[in-house]
Amino acid sequence: MATDELASKLSRRLQMEGEGGGEAPEQPGLNGAAAAAAAAGAPDETAEALGSADEELSAKLLRRADLNQGIGEPQSPSRRVFNPYTEFKEFSRKQIKDMEKMFKEYDAGRDGFIDLMELKLMMEKLGAPQTHLGLKNMIKEVDEDFDSKLSFREFLLIFRKAAAGELQEDSGLHVLARLSEIDVSTEGVKGAKSFFEAKVQAMNVSSRFEEEIKAEQEERKKQAEEMKQRKAAFKELQSTFK
């Protein structure tokens, strides 16, 4: 870092001057590079700037130590990076992509969240307008980090609860899931009668995901081939006019 390099140079200069005379008095309120700068006769502005940098670095190191020891503020679920395909295994890739498309459609602010006003517009477009209190209750039911808005992960929780039958039929979230036209029927391992049935169902889910990925790859190849053919046809058409 530039600060460390400057501090090292100033310390060497101070040491050389100290050999020829008395020690420079320590400046109150300064430490590290700032103290070295002040002792070497650097301008007050330089010493203060270095002191501020030292304090900022110390604060960051203390913050990191607190987090490592579990003292600091925990990271909220909505800010945590997650993989929807592994965390919400009860849904197919197509279902999750449909939910993501719907989420982005109503995330008017493009900030990765659906706030109260955006949820209000969503419910109105779905033909089921809600009261202000009703909207707040909808968010509250899945708001894990208490920030009064829906992250994509919390949005997926709505459909998880709907698929598991955990939503009251007259609740706003149940209405949202029903009117979204996203089929949330699942083929997961819930309700398996035995361990072996659960294993078989888990294997089926895994193979289903592989099939969906292969289908997506084939679709992309098909689109690329069609694009290639269109470009070739266009070039051939151009050549006829030359």
UniProtKB/Swiss-Prot annotation:
Query: What keywords appear on the UniProt entry?
Result: Acetylation, Calcium, Membrane, Metal-binding, Phosphoprotein, Repeat
- In which domain of life is the source organism classified? Eukaryota
Q: Where does Ca(2+) 2 bind?
A: 143, 145, 147, 149, 154
Which residues are recorded as modified (Phosphoserine)?
11, 76, 78
The PTM N6-acetyllysine maps to 235
A Pfam short name: AIF-1
Its function, per the record, reads:
May regulate B-cell receptor (BCR)-induced immature and primary B-cell apoptosis. Plays a role as negative regulator of the canonical NF-kappa-B-activating branch. Controls spontaneous apoptosis through the regulation of BCL2L1 abundance.
Q: What is this protein's name? A: EF-hand domain-containing protein D2
Instruction: Tell me the organism.
Output: Bos taurus (Bovine)
